Swiss-Prot record:
Family statement: Belongs to the GCKR-like family. MurNAc-6-P etherase subfamily.
Enzyme class: lyase
Alphabetical keyword list: Carbohydrate metabolism, Lyase
Protein name: N-acetylmuramic acid 6-phosphate etherase
PROSITE patterns in UniProt: GCKR (PS01272), SIS (PS51464)
InterPro entries in alphabetical order: Etherase_MurQ, Glucokinase_regulatory_CS, MURQ/GCKR, SIS_dom, SIS_dom_sf
One Pfam family linked to the record: GKRP_SIS_N
Length: 316
């Protein structure tokens, strides 16, 4: 018996999965000229957007339930292997600079850890216990949320994490790119992004990866909107951590509060880099500590804080 025959998870036939089936449009992929090749990819890459649109109800449900838990101090974890895991890490890493969120609030957990970001560690995804262990190492608990990402829906690492989440009462959300009857996953919310067979058979870094990234973008951004980190379409909790973001903060102060650039620099410094505090201070005359107290009273919701004082921003 070979080492492959001895492991049922490794030797299982996955040919029935939508993501593993050959795409009839690309049977002569290697014979196409470059222009035809590019055109075919462009045409197929319209499918991820429709797949995400078709899953909008389950994505909306996920956003509301995640936001509710995060308001109560819970955290959001993305768990995956290979491309799926890397996309989770990418989305989580963007939350602190965009929304000034605590790095602990949204975390990406990748099979194989940081080294797997640069060098593929695909074999680690076959270890179901590893999914549970990696979550345990981060103190994952009943108040937290897990989005288990597995394009083909069969990854033991992700299945193990989702099973663990459900067993302790955490929110378990599955995200896969095959129908649920092809690969059922233990979860409270089931997000299925049906992008169809890949042009390069089985290469789920393509359409499946694109749809996954789109869905994660929506989830994290919509959750942060619900948490009050956005006013209108401005990221009013942006972290002023580099010159580009300082410039963005100053433009937000100008556009929302009518605050000129030089005054904005002074206010931003007094507010410790917080756009929200700077806007409240400029509009109300409150000191930084008083503005912070007002904001905390309204759970960080800038619009509510302004309304409580009878104030309005330039763009309300």
């Amino acid at each position: 018996m070979t080492r492959f025959q001895s492991d049922a998870a490794v030797s299982a036939d996955r040919g029935h999965l939508m993501t593993e089936q050959p795409n009839p449009r690309s049977t002569a992929l290697d014979l196409l000229d470059t222009a035809e090749l590019v055109t075919l990819f462009v045409e197929e890459d319209r499918r991820p957007q429709q797949a995400v649109a078709d899953a909008s109800a389950s994505i909306s449900a996920a956003v509301d339930r995640i936001a509710s838990r995060l308001k109560d101090g819970g955290r959001l974890f993305y768990l995956g292997a290979g491309t799926s895991g890397r996309l989770g890490v990418l989305d989580a890493a963007e939350c602190p600079p965009t929304f000034c969120s605590d790095p602990e609030m949204v975390q990406g957990v990748l099979a194989g850890g940081a080294p797997a970001l640069l060098r593929s560690s695909e074999g680690l995804e076959d270890l179901e216990a590893a999914g549970r262990e990696d979550l345990d190492q981060r103190g994952f608990n009943a108040g937290d949320c897990l989005v288990g990402i597995a394009a083909g829906g069969t990854t033991p690492y992700v299945r193990g994490g989702l099973s663990h989440a459900r067993s302790i009462g955490a929110l378990a959300i599955a995200m896969a790119c095959v129908p649920s009857d092809q690969a059922p996953l233990p979860c409270d919310i089931d997000i299925r992004l049906l992008t169809g067979p890949e042009l390069l058979t089985g290469s789920t870094r393509l359409k499946a990866g694109t749809a996954t990234k789109m869905a994660l973008n929506i989830i994290s951004t919509a959750v942060m909107v619900r948490l009050g980190k956005v006013f209108g379409n401005r990221m009013v909790d942006v972290s002023a951590s580099n010159s580009k973001l300082v410039d963005r903060c100053l433009r937000i102060l100008r556009d929302l509060g009518g605050i000129e650039r030089d005054d904005g620099l002074v206010l931003l410094d007094q507010a410790g880099g917080s756009v929200k505090l700077a806007l409240l201070m400029a509009s109300s005359g409150l000191a930084s500590s008083e503005a912070m107290e007002l904001l905390q009273t309204h759970d960080g919701q800038l619009r509510q804080a302004f309304a409580s004082r009878g104030l309005k921003l330039a763009q309300s």
